[in-house]
A protein has these predicted regions:
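Short alpha-helical segments that sit at the start of domains
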Residues: 9-10, 78-115
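Short acidic, hydrophobic short linear motifs in intrinsically disordered regions
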Residues: 33-41, 108-126
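Short amphipathic alpha-helical interaction segments
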Residues: 45-53, 133-149
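Accessory beta->alpha helical hairpin/"wing" motif in late/C-terminal subdomains of nucleic-acid enzymes
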Residues: 73-75, 154-177
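Eukaryotic partner-binding/assembly regions in large regulatory complexes
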Residues: 1-79
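Long, low-complexity, intrinsically disordered segments
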Residues: 209-231
Length: 231
């Protein structure tokens, strides 16, 4: 019997339930971000049982990566299946968010959240002169909500269509839009389509977190983990 299976069998029934919920969350969202309040308990649970999760996902050709410096877990399909392919408009928003993340990060201490307003996203969109007008409010809402479903950002105040809405940007953006893609940004945006991809389960990725909460165990431990992960 493989070691991770033995470790799983030794778990309490309560922890096995937590394992199921956490594994499903990873499949739905691709990332677990320590800095995101709703992810933190799952991040800690994965960190505590990393070998079990990696062994479990490896059976289906998934690799669970731990970006310790950024405190992010990323689920990656080794065979490059179950991928979501972003269209051009979605790609523009991804690149804008990554640019804003970098700009804000320079001005903040490492312990603080990176927050942007809706109007900052709109201003950056127009400043790049990619298109001569903003997308509709409904289209912006759809894109931002979809990206939130991947734990790339989180709406904190207001509505997705509100220019005064506040969003927290997460370091998982750096996994989706890496430095190489930023360097070739002009060339990429000249395409009709773009090959940035994310892992995708068969479930609807635009589900609100509250729907997921219906199956969550309320008393998942939140004690600090003493492993190697950086927080």
């Amino acid at each position: 019997m493989m070691k991770w299976v033995e470790q799983y069998e030794k778990m309490s029934e309560k922890d096995k339930e937590k394992f199921q919920v956490t594994a499903n969350r990873l499949l739905n969202k691709t990332f677990l971000v320590y800095g995101k309040d709703k992810d933190r308990q799952y991040y800690r649970f994965v960190e505590k049982n990393l070998e079990v999760f990696q062994g479990y996902f490896s059976i289906a050709k998934w690799d669970l990566l731990h970006h310790k410096r950024l405190s992010v877990f990323q689920l990656y399909n080794i065979e490059e299946k179950n991928r979501y392919r972003f269209n051009l408009q979605e790609t523009i928003f991804l690149l804008i968010l990554r640019l804003l993340y970098d700009e804000k990060q320079k001005d903040l201490q490492l312990t603080r959240d990176i927050v942007v307003a809706g109007f900052e996203i709109q201003e950056k969109y127009m400043a790049l002169q990619i298109k001569d007008r903003l997308p509709s409010k409904e289209e912006m809402r759809r894109i931002l909500r979809m990206l939130s479903g991947y734990s790339l950002l989180e709406l904190k105040t207001g509505d997705y269509k509100d220019p005064e809405a506040k969003y927290v940007l997460y370091p998982s953006l750096k996994m989706v839009v890496d430095d190489a893609r930023l360097d070739s940004m002009g060339e990429l945006l000249g395409m009709d389509d773009f090959s940035i991809e994310l892992e995708e389960s068969d479930e609807d990725l635009e589900r609100e977190d509250e729907e997921q909460e219906d199956i969550e165990t309320e008393d998942i431990e939140t004690e600090d983990i003493t492993g190697e992960g950086e927080h």
